[in-house]
């Protein structure tokens, strides 16, 4: 999956803005190229996990369809931990058709990786930043 630089900048800024709470959203695009980020409120307001509101997920899907885009990944930040899936991330990654992108802000160093997860196991990792 290729993430346009402008999208990477947007999610970095959103993650910094929301810290220390985990920030989250969806990555939208076509043909494995991400062209937009769709931010969603972390309704858990937690520093260690996130949840999307069902109404926000529906709105995101409706928006993507209106633009002719697909949901290619969901993304969230790890304000104080590495850019790798936690046990909870692996447990909740239930769609093998999308990637799971994690942006780390640990120690002021930014890292963005995305993962394919199948049956609770990482089966593919891509480093983006």
Task: Indicate residue ranges for each PLM-predicted region.
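Conserved beta-strand-loop surface patch within small alpha/beta domains used
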Residues: 1-71, 80-129
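Residue-level "edge-of-site" marker
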Residues: 77
